[in-house]
């Protein structure tokens, strides 16, 4: 006979990975066309000059250049200017 009672199995012990959102390229950084600038949920940052908006609100560079973060009133936008 066993002298230890069987241990139960836990139903916890799992966790999902984070969604890896956030700013990927900061102001002043050089980028190439197609580089992801920001991954976000909704338009926290709006696309400015030479920046595209993906289906999941990802902002990406349309041209090679330098990233700038600008704000006009309450709206923050990201632009890329050729260097």
Curated annotation (Swiss-Prot):
<dbReference type="Pfam" id="PF01016">
    <property type="entry name" value="Ribosomal_L27"/>
</dbReference>
<dbReference type="GO" id="GO:0003735">
    <property type="term" value="F:structural constituent of ribosome"/>
</dbReference>
<dbReference type="GO" id="GO:0006412">
    <property type="term" value="P:translation"/>
</dbReference>
<keyword id="KW-0687">Ribonucleoprotein</keyword>
<dbReference type="InterPro" id="IPR001684">
    <property type="entry name" value="Ribosomal_bL27"/>
</dbReference>
<feature type="region of interest" description="Disordered">
    <location>
        <begin position="1"/>
        <end position="26"/>
    </location>
</feature>
<comment type="similarity">
    <text>Belongs to the bacterial ribosomal protein bL27 family.</text>
</comment>
<dbReference type="GO" id="GO:0022625">
    <property type="term" value="C:cytosolic large ribosomal subunit"/>
</dbReference>
<protein>
    <recommendedName>
        <fullName>Large ribosomal subunit protein bL27</fullName>
    </recommendedName>
</protein>
<keyword id="KW-0689">Ribosomal protein</keyword>
């Amino acid at each position: 006979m066993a002298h230890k009672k069987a241990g139960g199995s836990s139903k916890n012990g799992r966790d999902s990975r984070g969604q890896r959102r956030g700013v990927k390229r900061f102001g002043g950084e050089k980028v190439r066309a197609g580089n992801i600038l920001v991954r976000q949920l909704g338009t926290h940052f709006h696309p400015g000059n030479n920046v595209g908006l993906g289906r999941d609100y990802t902002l990406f560079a349309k041209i090679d250049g330098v990233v700038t973060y600008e704000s006009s009133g309450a709206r923050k936008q990201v632009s890329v200017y050729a260097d």
